[in-house]
Amino acid sequence: MKTFVLHIFIFAFVAFASASRDSAKKIGSQYDNFETCITEHGLTEDDIFSIGEVSSGNHKTNHEDTELHKNGCVIQCMLEKDGLMSGADYDEEKMREDYIKETGAQPGDQRIEALNACMHETKDMEDKCDKSLVLVACVLAAEAVLADSSEAA
């Protein structure tokens, strides 16, 4: 069974690194629990943000707060089903392990540093849905910046 980056990468999370190249793809759609989680939250695939929309930050300006929250709940659902979150709490070590497996990142890789920074940035958020979306958005944005800087080099 596939697990998160995006899981952010999904982590989504955070393991969305490979998927982040396909900006039209729906966030988390490549993971086994995607359909289950959107159904559990009464959404359809059309309701879910695209990877490009989240990595660029456009999801924050193009959508209402309720849409943001619902998308975050779907992400949190996938993270929880993959054992990466329990409620609003991350399993940071498992999150890193899964991210490394998904992305092939090695110790010292800037993507791992970005994941750590994003987990630190969101660790005190209490709402599990908002926390999940902010985490994944942070990781995807960092991956986009790192990809742009490596392409420019």
From Swiss-Prot:
InterPro entries registered for this protein in UniProt: PBP/GOBP, PBP_GOBP_sf, Pheromone-bd_protein_Gp-9
Span of the signal peptide: 1-19
GO cellular component assignments: extracellular space
Result after altering residue 120 to Q: In allele B4, allele B5 and allele B6
Effect of residue 17 to V: In allele B4 and allele B5
Protein's GO biological process: response to pheromone; social behavior
A GO MF term: pheromone binding
Keyword vocabulary terms for this entry: Behavior, Disulfide bond, Pheromone response, Pheromone-binding, Secreted, Signal, Transport
Gene3D superfamilies membership: Pheromone/general odorant binding protein domain
CDD domains: PBP_GOBP
Subunit structure: Homodimer.
The protein's name: Pheromone-binding protein Gp-9
Naturally occurring in which organism (per UniProt): Solenopsis geminata (Tropical fire ant)
